[in-house]
Amino acid sequence: MGMFNCLHGNNMSGQHDIPPEVGEQPEQEPLEAPGAAAPGAGAGPAEEMATEPDSEPSNNEPVPDETGSEISGPPEDSKSDIQSPCQAFEEVRVGGDYSPPPEEAMPFETQQPSLGDFWPTLEQPGPSGTPSGLQAFNPAILEPGTPTGASPGLGAYTPPPEEAMPFEFNEPAQGDHSQPPLQVPDLAPGGPEALVPRALPAEPGNIRFENAGFREDYSPPPEESVPFQVGGEEFGGDSPPPGLPRVIPQIGIGGEFPTVAVPSALCLAPAENAPPLWVRGAIDRPFREAVRSPPNFACDSPPMEITRPLLEIGRASIGVDDDTAVNMDSPPIASDGPPIEVSGAPDKSECAERPPVEREAAEMEGSPTTATAVEGKVPSPERGDGSSTQPEAMDAKPAPAAQAVSTGSDAGAPTDSAMLTDSQSDAGEDGTAPGTPSDLQSDPEELEEAPAVRADPDGGAAPVAPATPAESESEGSRDPAAEPASEAVPATTAESASGAAPVTQVEPAAAAVSATLAEPAARAAPITPKEPTTRAVPSARAHPAAGAVPGAPAMSASARAAAARAAYAGPLVWGARSLSATPAARASLPARAAAAARAASAARAVAAGRSASAAPSRAHLRPPSPEIQVADPPTPRPPPRPTAWPDKYERGRSCCRYEASSGICEIESSSDESEEGATGCFQWLLRRNRRPGLPRSHTVGSNPVRNFFTRAFGSCFGLSECTRSRSLSPGKAKDPMEERRKQMRKEAIEMREQKRADKKRSKLIDKQLEEEKMDYMCTHRLLLLGAGESGKSTIVKQMRILHVNGFNGEGGEEDPQAARSNSDGEKATKVQDIKNNLKEAIETIVAAMSNLVPPVELANPENQFRVDYILSVMNVPNFDFPPEFYEHAKALWEDEGVRACYERSNEYQLIDCAQYFLDKIDVIKQADYVPSDQDLLRCRVLTSGIFETKFQVDKVNFHMFDVGGQRDERRKWIQCFNDVTAIIFVVASSSYNMVIREDNQTNRLQEALNLFKSIWNNRWLRTISVILFLNKQDLLAEKVLAGKSKIEDYFPEFARYTTPEDATPEPGEDPRVTRAKYFIRDEFLRISTASGDGRHYCYPHFTCAVDTENIRRVFNDCRDIIQRMHLRQYELL
């Protein structure tokens, strides 16, 4: 019986302590056609077995190790008891300090776990039996080149390919069907060691996968694909370097294990220069390791018959073709072949599923295969689940690409449809559908462009390829008798198992040499984005027995050896047509050498044409051919895809170690490696030197040696382009939380700055308020109260004249220049007020002449028309004061009748300034009249509202508030009672014989007494002292001296009043006047003393508001009183 071998994520080469899982070999149905594995991302065998309810418990449950990863199987000692005595140098492991490059064939070790009683021992026909060492060897994964007499133990030494002893296979007659083809795991070189497990424990059968299709959203579980870390970070010291997977068993999808006997005999013949063993899919394939043959094999061993169970393919990761069957019916290998040439294995980053956005990138690396034909079934490219389709159904669909090939071959020229279609690399053989990734299969357009091509089962159909005229003639002239000989080396398909190379867009000149040998060394071209001006270069199929290209010169022995070495450097295709192969298909070694020479020369010509054309982008180019020799310089790699693969935390369980973009530029060796990363020793050493505790970005930036070599010699290894591409690649997406934190920090900083500015502004405001408060406390606020027309506004005018340098509008100005300018402007506006006073005075007198009892007559009756004129303009608004007005007013004022009416002014309401302005008619009527300060003081303007005047006396601030004295204006006074230092109550002493305007029955002096009493007794003003200004002393003296209006007539008490002894008359003042004024004073003092409580006082002063010197002297006397009141107000006195 046999075993089907595929890669397992937890059982890779180099991990010797993890044997294959128990219970992974269900019985399989009969095998009809082995082939490449179907690329898929479905659940692996271990995961399906874990979900099977009837399965027996396994003794290798996942055991988490120190790093948190799961390791399947019981731990075993990685060292073997059997060590090869011919070991040439010390075994190199992953955790070691040195790993030779892939050019040097690295030894690999094999492990021999016990098989138990499940697998039968190997049968070997012939006189000699199988040695005991091979009884425990798994026939399904038998290493080619393993000696029949002895099996190398764990840690055995395998020499490099230059010293390796060749071996050859002898095929018995085709009639003997007693042995299936031997399957050899596709391994790739490039690492320190390669582990090939030899047996599997028993596993319950009757397990069939329900879903064998493709799932794009699937990531294999850790049991199937667990990446490893360099330096034993994940599994200890025996973890392989990146890109070297472990070989694990794969479950078949059959119910039983019937044996299909296929004739196959293994004869290991010693030879000095045997050709290398070709392993299908060893180049440009992820999870591949090259299998090398140990030296000193015995050639006289009898044939060995090996049986194995049926092969049925479940699922495999896209781009991973690790279940290729091994054909024991390959042509014989001569004993004088060149040494083994081994290509490197690509990085592991291609394992698991590919994102849908990676279609073009995945096509660059080699078009993966679909499900292999199992039991005569071919996975249908039209179905997304990867289910199989019968070959008959495939035959019913003729492939247009295949027809184009036959037509092009007969005509000897390539057809446009064959050259421009994407199916040129998708044509399979043995009924195998073109391998496409799951994302490509889900695309109807791609499916239409890549139709399934099923060739004749015995014909070995070649991929769709335009052939050169020479080869077209060779193909067209080939006779049917020569066809069977070509079946031994089937045509390469577009799958990655045949070492697929990317389709390179080349110029027509390079396309002339596009036909290459279809040996396993020739690589089919996967699908790549088409460009309008370029044509794909698919791999063409050539007859291996043709010997040479027609017209090609003869080759010498050394050239043939070099060509054979280049040709055999590619993978060996075993068993692709094993059931249909015949002994006649074996080709001779010279034919192989010539074909290999053609392949190498064509590939180098393609590479030369590609570099010369410079039409395609280097980012989509791969090494031109897998036949790169050891002596060739390192091949520059295209830059890695920066955003193709998700990050570590986004790829599921299967990819937790390899990042999407590496922090260092990876340098390829001469091995043909994948896009994502090299698996050569140099790259392995670079990764190994990384410290596991630090991220890659930190390691790159902190390694000066690597940075120096990268900058100095980066161009030699393709580092400049890689670095440039990485620098141009889009950066990692910004973390929204980090952006939010930055925004919050920015807002916090702005808020702090705003708060700081607000605090500073608040401090300035507080300081200003403090200054204002201090000024407010140091300011003396004086409130002018009194009855109407008492002279309050005149007092304010005097303060402005005395302490504010004239009139400056309604308020004071500290700037003298501004005060003067404002004073001039205000004086100009006061002219109209003065004229209005003049008009009002003459009109009032003329009107009273007829209203008085007895009426007053004009002394000159000729002035009657003048009286009529004055009465006619009495109520005219906006009077413009024409010159005749002044003439009529002057003539009337000179009339004696008018003067007599003025003497009775106490009987009607006449303004106090009437006589003053009537005497100045000649001055006022002038056009350039400018009122004087006395004119402004005399001018009468009705005060309505509250007016504040600020002035300063000896650096002491005073605020004086003027209010209207009429009854309807007194309600506004309450607004000025707050924080008043003193109240200046102004009384018109001369108004004793006059009545108020509001009431013709109320005496003005009596009105003033009543108002003073109310203010003095007001509860809000009971703590505020009152300065009493007994105003209009000049008018009072005139009336008293005139004798026409006696005070005792209005105030009878005056008759009994005597002048007090402390009275101080003015110089030259009449005693009658002194007695009159002191009488009025005592009337107010009697009110204050009658209700006084000692908390406020009354300070009387005799004033004449129009006398500036009098007001200056009075105000200076009041300053001390005001300051004393201020100190008492704040309880400082």
Curated annotation (Swiss-Prot):
Q: Which InterPro entries match?
A: Gprotein_alpha_S, Gprotein_alpha_su, GproteinA_insert, P-loop_NTPase
Spell out the Pro residues composition-biased ranges. Answer: 633-643
Q: Does the keyword Glycoprotein apply?
A: no
GO molecular function: any one?
Answer: adenylate cyclase regulator activity
Residue positions binding Mg(2+): S793, T943
EC number assigned by the record: 3.6.5.-
Modified residues annotated as ADP-ribosylarginine in this record: R940
- Give the matching Gene3D superfamilies: GI Alpha 1, domain 2-like (1.10.400.10), P-loop containing nucleotide triphosphate hydrolases (3.40.50.300)
GO annotations of cellular component type: apical plasma membrane; dendrite; heterotrimeric G-protein complex; membrane; plasma membrane
Region ranges (G5 motif): 1103-1108
Q: Name one GO biological process term.
A: positive regulation of cold-induced thermogenesis
Q: What does the entry list as the binding residues for GTP? A: 786-794, 936-943, 962-966, 1031-1034, 1105
The enzyme's main class, written as a single word, is hydrolase
User: How the protein assembles, per its UniProt entry?
Assistant: G proteins are composed of 3 units; alpha, beta and gamma. The alpha chain contains the guanine nucleotide binding site. Interacts through its N-terminal region with ALEX which is produced from the same locus in a different open reading frame. This interaction may inhibit its adenylyl cyclase-stimulating activity. Interacts with MAGED2.
Misc remark: This protein is produced by a bicistronic gene which also produces the ALEX protein from an overlapping reading frame.
Family, per entry: Belongs to the G-alpha family. G(s) subfamily.
What is the official name of this protein in its record?
Answer: Guanine nucleotide-binding protein G(s) subunit alpha isoforms XLas
> What lineage, starting at the top, does this entry show?
Eukaryota, Metazoa, Chordata, Craniata, Vertebrata
Q: Report the gene name.
A: Gnas
